Amino acid sequence: MENKSLESSQTDLKLVAHPRAKSKVWKYFGFDTNAEGCILQWKKIYCRICMAQIAYSGNTSNLSYHLEKNHPEEFCEFVKSNTEQMREAFATAFSKLKPESSQQPGQDALAVKAGHGYDSKKQQELTAAVLGLICEGLYPASIVDEPTFKVLLKTADPRYELPSRKYISTKAIPEKYGAVREVILKELAEATWCGISTDMWRSENQNRAYVTLAAHFLGLGAPNCLSMGSRCLKTFEVPEENTAETITRVLYEVFIEWGISAKVFGATTNYGKDIVKACSLLDVAVHMPCLGHTFNAGIQQAFQLPKLGALLSRCRKLVEYFQQSAVAMYMLYEKQKQQNVAHCMLVSNRVSWWGSTLAMLQRLKEQQFVIAGVLVEDSNNHHLMLEASEWATIEGLVELLQPFKQVAEMLSASRYPTISMVKPLLHMLLNTTLNIKETDSKELSMAKEVIAKELSKTYQETPEIDMFLNVATFLDPRYKRLPFLSAFERQQVENRVVEEAKGLLDKVKDGGYRPAEDKIFPVPEEPPVKKLMRTSTPPPASVINNMLAEIFCQTGGVEDQEEWHAQVVEELSNFKSQKVLGLNEDPLKWWSDRLALFPLLPKVLQKYWCVTATRVAPERLFGSAANVVSAKRNRLAPAHVDEQVFLYENARSGAEAEPEDQDEGEWGLDQEQVFSLGDGVSGGFFGIRDSSFL
């Protein structure tokens, strides 16, 4: 009797799919609801076929697994229904494949039976496409064992034989790694100077910490055309103990392996003590703090001020209430309709990133009156209402953080080296956004003071970094006037440029410096005046003339140094007299068009602009592409992290931007979701089980 009543209660369940479901697997599963249609429990799901209860944690991997193990017929139906969805996910991988010429049915069967024509060519093309998907999409090699992936390829071409995971891991990926490595070795051999950057990240799935090392250089991508190059060199695991020693050893080995020991001029890092110590031990001249990391450090310090911290905590509780209460969510929607406000949910934030906090505060400010209307009618939650002074502080924080968001967006959209923009941006922020006004509240004034102190301490109170950034800015024809410096400071910058140019000329003369690019914009081997004298004078006709020439035409004395100095000063003066370039114009194109006019200054430019402003590409640091990359890296097996991240990063160099996730980025600047449901194709189809890493 008890079993019958249980069965009867289960069959009486009113199941509904997830309200934001995307995967077609929800056809077979649902949540239990009450009489009003509200979901009773979000962490329990029922199978519509066998009424089994399944735990739900935010993704659909266990749902498809339940179908595969218990309901094979429905699983096949589910796989077939998703074929088109899978086709779209892999469209890029197959876009380069040429359509096979049409054949008669008899001829087709004969070709399959004989094994020619198709196997040799088409098999290679499809295997190359699969390898491209794995490498450029950061998929683990175990994807070739996924049933749905096999179904996709069989649907695309039933004759194709998919290689094994072992072949992909031990042969195909290493061969592609070797080919790409040879190309990058040639690029670095031709580079005059290079900067490095270190991206420290953690794989949450494996609880391992990694460092991805990249090299950056300013070279000649085409004849008479300067271009910025960025190449990933290595990804290595760092232990919890002896981190600095490990990083130092690996960096040294990488410098030797890639032949850049004498070319590394600067390093851009998050300014962690371990990486800074490693760079110091390796005598890296410039330690450049990551601009994005510095922004976050200063803003997070401001958020930790007692009153601001308490306010942000109240804001998070308010958002959490609306996200977790179906009644409150419904009332919010109704109030938005009544007040003719666009329907949108409140935004939660991640405590560690300021961009998501800004998104939360902006949405609260937009919905201020709607929220107040809901809470007035909810007597049990009046304590969540914010006071007028708190709303004023929220408005002030939004106004304070908005320029930082605009700076982040500008850096992300920039197609040029960003190191020359650091000083102008800092000057703008320190003298406008962070300038304390009389109308500012005490909390807002303290926040501005804390952020300004962090920016100044990091960039302006270190003389070497300050001078480096000033020179990098001066060499940008958009900012060369340096209006934020005094006349004395500008003269110091110009003197540094002259010293750098003369130093490069001295290396040329000593034979210790001969970059490959000299064939494009050559540095003269001697002062122009003496070269003219030598070429215009006929060769000596006697031994006496040779002796006289040795006495009166010898080079390398004080006279030469003066002529070198005069040439550099003249070139610098010519550069200063050129028209200032527009802010939206390309500084690299400006220099490329004038390589013949300026034979020396581009050499200094290559040395200073190879150092980057951020430790990773700005569009990844500030944008939502960060989530895509992080999620993909997390699923890689430890043994393949180095090769696959290497191939992924170098495949994307100069390619289109990483497609953005729907969730917030590393900085939360693009966050529009209420919370991540993990309910998509990536969760249902490509959720890699733990056994995939074995």
Swiss-Prot record:
This is E3 SUMO-protein ligase ZBED1. Ubiquitously expressed at low levels. Expression is highest in skeletal muscle, heart, spleen and placenta. GO terms for cellular component: centrosome; chromatin; nuclear membrane; nucleoplasm; nucleus; PML body. The gene is ZBED1. Functions as an E3-type small ubiquitin-like modifier (SUMO) ligase which sumoylates CHD3/Mi2-alpha, causing its release from DNA. This results in suppression of CHD3/Mi2-alpha transcription repression, increased recruitment of RNA polymerase II to gene promoters and positive regulation of transcription including H1-5 and ribosomal proteins such as: RPS6, RPL10A, and RPL12. The resulting increased transcriptional activity drives cell proliferation. Binds to 5'-TGTCG[CT]GA[CT]A-3' consensus sequences in gene promoters of ribosomal proteins. A motif (Nuclear localization signal) lies at residues 530-534. Residues 571-651 are annotated as: Required for nuclear localization and homodimerization. Keywords: DNA-binding, Host-virus interaction, Metal-binding, Nucleus, Transcription, Transcription regulation, Transferase, Ubl conjugation, Ubl conjugation pathway, Zinc, Zinc-finger. Homodimer and homomultimer. Homodimerization is necessary for protein nuclear localization and DNA binding. Interacts with KPNB1; required for nuclear import of ZBED1/hDREF. Interacts with CHD3/Mi2-alpha. Interacts with SUMO1. Interacts with UBE2I/UBC9. Residues 652-694 are annotated as: Required for the formation of higher order complexes of ZBED1 with consensus DNA binding sequences. Pfam families: Dimer_Tnp_hAT, zf-BED. GO terms for molecular function: DNA-binding transcription activator activity, RNA polymerase II-specific; DNA-binding transcription factor activity, RNA polymerase II-specific; identical protein binding; protein dimerization activity; RNA polymerase II cis-regulatory region sequence-specific DNA binding; sequence-specific DNA binding; sequence-specific double-stranded DNA binding; SUMO ligase activity. It comes from the Eukaryota. Residues 552-624 are annotated as: Required for DNA binding. Pathway: Protein modification; protein sumoylation. Autosumoylated with SUMO1, SUMO2, and SUMO3. Residues 315-694 are annotated as: Required for interaction with human adenovirus early E1A protein. Induction: Expression is linked to the cell cycle: low in serum-starved fibroblasts, increasing during the G1/S phase, highest during the S/G2 phase and then decreasing again. Zn(2+) binds at C47, C50, H66, H71. InterPro entries: HATC_C_dom, RNaseH-like_sf, Vacuolar_transposase_reg, Znf_BED, Znf_C2H2_sf. A zinc finger (BED-type) spans 20-78. The keyword Transcription regulation applies. GO terms for biological process: negative regulation by host of viral genome replication; positive regulation of transcription by RNA polymerase II; protein autosumoylation; protein sumoylation; regulation of DNA-templated transcription; regulation of transcription by RNA polymerase II. Signal peptide: none annotated. Its EC number is 2.3.2.-.
